[in-house]
Amino acid sequence: MKNFLKISFLFFVFIFGSLTAQKADFYDDIQHFKKLDAEKTPPKDAILFLGSSSFTMWKDVADYFPDKTIINRAFGGSRLLNLNYYSEDLLNPYQPKQVVIYCGENDIAHAEKPSANEVFKRFKQFYKTVRAHYPNANIAYVSIKYSPSREQYWPTMKQVNKKIKNFMNAKKNAEFIDITESMNNENGSIRKDLYLEDMLHMKPEGYKIWTKVMYPYLK
């Protein structure tokens, strides 16, 4: 009996230890941000970019906006769920004058297939947290792009964009930046030439278009 209890206890310790040792999704990305901030104090009154890979892969974003000070803390593959989970880590170290968000596309395309209302709910939660941290900062949301590889999700993306647009338009010191039409051909179809082979991430030409649309909104 004693041996059984001993073995059971050791098994419990092993399982518990294994579970607690597992890292949360994107843990390493957050630690990387902390390392960057420790090496160099983040500037005050900058523009804080948060979100998923469309921002993450914009590594030379400062070259597109040379007269702006931008802190890019986006991490590829992230969902609004992850922004909410890591909100303290993403917001506490900074004192921005503006927060620009691109996120939600991965929520919609996730295997759990959340509804437009659920994705919108996640955004509102993050917006509320950002506003609580930065009462006077401008908050801007860049609309979800209609990536060719995710055409099956376009209807939900359009619903989410509409909901967030109406929400942001009703808020003070908030912006909805719609990049969707600027990425279309004259006939209204998506310009696939703006995308890499994966038809998900953009080429530099896509970012040039984003720059033209976004610039008037940046503080």
What does each of the following model-derived ranges do?
Residues M1-A24:
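Bacterial Sec-dependent N-terminal signal peptides
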Residues F14, Y146-K219:
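Catalytic His-Asp segment of secreted/periplasmic serine-dependent ester chemistry enzymes
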Residues K23-R122, P148, Y153-K158:
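Conserved SGNH/GDSL esterase-like catalytic core that processes O-acyl groups on lipids
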Residues E39-K40, V61-D63, R131, N166-M168, ...:
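Short secondary-structure boundary/capping segments
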Residues R73, V142, I177-I179:
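Conserved beta-strand termini and adjacent loop/short-helix elements that scaffold enzyme active sites
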Residues E88, N92, G104, K128-P135, ...:
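Sec-exported extracytoplasmic/periplasmic mature domains
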Residues Y102, V142-S143:
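Alpha/beta-hydrolase-fold catalytic nucleophile elbow
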Residues E118-V142, Q159, K163-A174:
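Charged, glycine-enriched surface loops/patches
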